[in-house]
Amino acid sequence: MAGNVQEKQLRWYNIALMSFITVWGFGNVVNNYANQGLVVVFSWVFIFALYFTPYALIVGQLGSTFKDGRGGVSTWIKHTMGPGLAYLAAWTYWVVHIPYLAQKPQAILIALGWAMKGDGSLIKEYSVVALQGLTLVLFIFFMWVASRGMKSLKIVGSVAGIAMFVMSLLYVAMAVTAPAITEVHIATTNITWETFIPHIDFTYITTISMLVFAVGGAEKISPYVNQTRNPGKEFPKGMLCLAVMVAVCAILGSLAMGMMFDSRNIPDDLMTNGQYYAFQKLGEYYSMGNTLMVIYAIANTLGQVAALVFSIDAPLKVLLGDADSKYIPASLCRTNASGTPVNGYFLTLVLVAILIMLPTLGIGDTNNLYKWLLNLNSVVMPLRYLWVFVAFIAVVRLAQKYKPEYVFIRNKPLAMTVGIWCFAFTAFACLTGIFPKMEAFTAEWTFQLALNVATPFVLVGLGLIFPLLARKANSK
C-alpha cells in the first residue's frame, strides 16, 4: 500500500509543466503567424477551446483505461479493435515521421547558419539540388549516430530543449514589455478588433492543419495518468492548466510577433527564418546585438540534432519491438549485435532519401522547399492523432467493459459526439492542408499538390503491403 502511494506522487502542476515542455515550442507561434498574421489569435482561442482541451483530456482517459499498456496508441487499438488495426495504428505512428525526418536536416543547416554567420544566407548559397544532396548526406550521418546509441547526445538534446523552452518564454516576456521599456515602434499599425477576425475563405481553411500540427502530441502524456495523485481530479486539472499555459503563450507570442512583423506585410521567409529574426530584433530592442539570437540558434541546432537522432530510432523500435509476425516480416525486425534493426533503418533511409530528392524535380527555391516540407508535416503528422480518437470512440462504445480511474465525460452520447468531432476536425484539417499556400494553378503549385496527395497515401499504403509479405514468408 505504501509503495502504491509512493508511486503516485505527481501533482497537477507537475503534469502541466511536463506536458507543456512536450507539446509546445516557439516554432509553433512563428509558423502559424507566418500563415495567418494577427488573425491567428482568434484561431488559437478556437483551437484551444474546441479541440486541444478535449484532445488532452481524451488522452487522459485512454491512459487511465490502459495503464499497463506500453505501446501507447497501438495498445489502445489492440484492446478495443483487435491486432490488425493495432498494427496499422503502429505503422501510421512510425511512417508519419518520414516527412519529419526529411525536414530535420534542413532545419539543422538553417539553425547552424544563423549560429555561425548571424543570418539566413547559408542555405541560399546552394542550389536546391545541392542543398538536398547535403541534407541527405547529413541524414545518413545522423542515422549512423542513431545506430551507435549515443546517450550523451540525448542529454545534450534535453539541455538544449530546456534552454529553447526557457528562451521561448523569455521572448514572450521581453517582447510584450518592450514598448513600455524601450522606444520600439509597433510594426503592425492601427490594430482594432477587426484585425483579429478571420475572413473565412479557402485560403484560411488550408492553414488549419498547421494549428492542429502545433498542438498535437498529447498522447505522449498518457503514461503519467496513473502516476498522478488522485488522477480523477488532479490529471484533468493539470490538463486544463496546460491548455491555459499554451493558450497564453500562443496568444502573447502571436501579439509579440505582430509588434515585430507587420501583420499585413509578412516576410516571405518568416516560416524559414522567423525564429531567428525574432530573437535578432529582440536583441536590437535591448541593445544586446545578436547575443540572444546566437544563443537560441546554438540551442536550436543541438535540440534539432537530438530530435532527429531520437526520431530515427525510437518510433522504429516501437513499431518493430513488439511486432506481430502475422503483419511484419521477421526479416524487417532483424537486428545487429548492437540491437539496431538494420533492415528497418534501410527502409527508413530509402523512404527519406526519396522524399528529400524528389521535390528537386519541381521546387526551384530553397525557401519554398522548406515551407513545403513543413506544410507536408502538418498534413501527414496529424494522421496519427486520428487513431487516438478512434480508440476513444471504441472505449466509449465499450464503456461497461472498462472502469478507468479518470473519465473525461460520463454521458455516453456526449462523449461519443466529442470523439467524433475531434476525429472529423482532424481529418478535415489534413484534407484541406494538402493545398499549397501559394499562387494557385502554377506549375510548382500543381507539383506540390501532387506530392501532398501522393505522400500520405503511399506512406500509409505501404503498411498494407507488409502483412502480405509476412503471410508469404510464414507460409514458407
Language model features with spans:
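Helix-loop-helix connectors at the membrane interface of multi-pass transporters/channels
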Residues: 78, 106-130, 167, 227-231, ...
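C-terminal membrane-solvent junction of multi-pass transporters and transport-like membrane proteins
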Residues: 6-7, 335-336, 385-435, 447-448
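Helix-loop-helix junctions that connect adjacent transmembrane segments
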Residues: 8, 42, 125-130, 155-294, ...
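TM-loop-TM module centered on a large, flexible mid-protein loop between adjacent transmembrane helices
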Residues: 75-76, 82, 238-309, 328-377
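Hydrophobic transmembrane alpha-helices that form the core helical bundles
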Residues: 54-61, 69-135, 304-315, 375, ...
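Membrane-interface "cap" regions at the ends of multi-pass membrane proteins
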Residues: 1-42, 46, 52-60, 68, ...
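Transmembrane alpha-helical segments of multi-pass small-molecule transport proteins
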Residues: 12-19, 117-151, 165-173, 211-215, ...
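Membrane-helix boundary/coupling elements in multi-pass transport proteins
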Residues: 92-108, 220-224, 287-330, 385-392
